[in-house]
């Protein structure tokens, strides 16, 4: 994952959607790159995608990134998601859908990825495919990919409904309720706003 932040709101809608999926994916992935955080701090605070609904949560995300150091954000990541044994907050869909890791939701996700011709590169991604960063990266591909048979609105809507809409709100709830979450609580609020925009867009297709 090597996404660059959308530093202007003048991007066309599909490019902006793909960029935001990529940025959220990378911000939830460890280790956070100092270069990405530096870009976030320099980003304009108007909404990176058309629509005022995203503007305030985006402004808050940029603001908290500017207010915290790289070390503070890294420490918060380790506190919430790292450590030995059970993390304080899980980043995996199976946990929210079944209460356990590596369960049926992950198996179904792998089947759906196989149908799309996608698979996890174990050399670059040690986490399982139901990690929030992985499913957001898949959505980025479905929005921005060049193969129209795979990267199209129908595939986006189907994958989103099955593997993001079903559990991402619960992850956002957990982060926003956690007393030690600051940067990631704000990221959760922006993520929630973004997926709400996506849900509305897909609903209009139905």
Residue ranges and their predicted role:
Residues 1-206:
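Surface/interface-facing alpha-helical segments and adjacent flexible terminal/loop regions used
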């Amino acid at each position: 994952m090597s996404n660059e932040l959308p530093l202007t709101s003048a991007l066309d809608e599909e490019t902006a959607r793909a960029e935001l999926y990529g940025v959220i994916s990378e911000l939830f992935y460890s280790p956070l790159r100092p270069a990405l955080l530096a870009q976030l701090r320099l980003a304009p605070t108007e909404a990176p995608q058309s629509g005022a609904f995203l503007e305030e949560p985006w402004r808050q995300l940029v603001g908290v990134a500017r207010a915290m150091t790289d070390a503070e954000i890294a420490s918060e990541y380790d506190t919430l998601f790292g450590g030995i044994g059970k993390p304080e907050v899980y980043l995996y869909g199976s946990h929210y859908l079944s209460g356990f890791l590596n369960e049926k939701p992950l198996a179904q996700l792998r089947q759906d990825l196989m149908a799309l011709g996608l698979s996890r590169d174990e050399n670059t991604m040690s986490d399982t495919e139901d990690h929030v960063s992985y499913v957001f990266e898949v959505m980025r591909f479905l929005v921005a990919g060049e193969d129209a048979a795979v990267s199209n609105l129908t595939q986006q809507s189907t994958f989103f409904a099955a593997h993001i809409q079903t559990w991402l709100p619960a992850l956002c709830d957990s982060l926003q309720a956690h007393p030690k979450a600051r940067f990631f609580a704000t990221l959760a609020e922006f993520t929630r706003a973004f997926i709400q925009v996506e849900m509305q867009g897909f609903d209009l297709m139905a």
